[in-house]
Amino acid sequence: MPSWRVHRDVTGDVYDVLCSMYGGRWPCDIDINEVVEHVVDPDRNPDTVLTVTEKCVCDGKEVDITYCREQSSYVGSGYSRRCIVESRREERGARHHGGLNEVMWRYYLLLAARSYVVDNDRSTKCCWALARALHYAQDSVLSRKVQVVGVFGTYTSGDFHDLVEDALDTYAYGYLKPEILQRLVMEGVNAALREPPMRIRPTHEFFNPDVSVTAVIENAIKATAYTFAKFFEIINYANNRKESIGRVVRRLRLVSGIGIAVLILSILLMAALHQPGITNAMGALLIIGLILTSTWPLYRSFKESELYVLGIVNYPTGMLRIRMRRGASVITETYKPLLT
């Protein structure tokens, strides 16, 4: 929910309007039919998330997990309190509704851009990844309790699933009229254009879940336009910066490689030769090697997302993991995308 028909029609219609309005700015050369077909993939073949909940019980009382780990140092030293760390593992489908699943949305948006820029892909993985990002964007606006005003009162999705889906379908096609669609697409696109291309942390109101059917449809259209615009802005930025960033990274790798070679050479010479003068020279060479080697971490001055889109690094695993506290427990969520 929304129905697959709404997902597909919103995706195709928003793309057509967006490219007719901004075709001079963006290439609009992806296979939109592939995107439309696969925008429902997260419903057919869902991504998953592994949730690990850790809690600590000391003498029958639940305590903070950090305190529990501190007490473990007393084990075997006569400390009387007995602390046990308990963990629970649960794997389930990744969340779609009730707010944007930013982890999965960001992952698929960047994967689509990387496939476009690095693999020159316009019709397969690029489109499939973009379709998944669009699905998460469209579903984010749907609260777990959508209100539908009926003849006998106001109902929620928990009460009347089919009624809500029918209402979304009905309202959606009222909002897919050209004059309304154009206004909503402009709002979504302008939100993307007002921020730097590589800022991948959406905070816009239209990603917030709503209980009104009309607001859900409007926000889904804006979120779709925003996601398309963000994708095209990222690939434009990456293509413009590809040569300059690649050149800098290659130089850093070369200098760092020379530094490692100098380090190894100086250590071997210092071990083989013991004359004071030569040893001092080797010490100086060792320092030079250390300085040269230390230049490689400068690549971190670029954003990880930038380097990933350009094919320089793999996707940072830390960006697929969330750690949070809930009371005395620590919860770790590790997302497992279906498409890699």
Give residue spans per PLM region.
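Membrane-proximal extracellular "stem/stalk" segments
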Residues: A238-R247
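Short alpha-helix carrying the canonical HExxH Zn2+-binding catalytic motif
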Residues: C126-Q138
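N-terminal, motif-rich segments that launch catalysis or mediate targeting to/interaction with membranes
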Residues: M1-W128, V146-A238, R251, G257-A281, ...
